[in-house]
């Protein structure tokens, strides 16, 4: 999306997946750096490519680079739009007879990592006999700068929230006496499904991060980490006990309720 918006080439962009035979080395996607770091590199690369397109188009039009514009399909003279050359002809010309290739490389690093922000509110229903927790609704408001792709940003937030819910309530790894994990499939390692979660609402409070591509910040970790304290606080508000170990299972809740009632009795 960053490259498309920068170069104004929505129908001419094809993204190829990484290929270890040809792609540069990449240590991985982590630390909420994909959009913030890689996106900025893509923006710089697209700006440089756009400049190359205009420069070669100006040569073909026999005019100055400063006197042409690019609309995503053609390079044309600013004072005479009828004087133009198509992107296809520019690409063909770049193959021979000219020293301006339509191929660019850029890198980007940032000493800064501006934090995203998120507010989460959980509504739960706790069965004090069985300890079962039903998440009725989870509302979130996220500040990740300017969302590059609003639809994908919303889906990523919803997916991260689901991961956070699983981390809080169900996901756990235990080991037997041999040191082997007992949760060796999704039958034992339970992740939340759609029927386990009520309504999830995500809204965005847009800001502008000048160091990010188009004002974007990261979003990866904050949407996973926020459900934990929100759900934990909701359970504490319901039964009066705060938990300090994850996951907060029905067994732990039922035992906590029994201990509280026993102490009161």
Indicate residue ranges for each PLM-predicted region.
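C-terminal catalytic domains of large/alpha subunits in multi-subunit enzymes
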Residues: 8-265
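Short, small-residue-biased leader/transition segments that mark boundaries at the very start
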Residues: 1-9
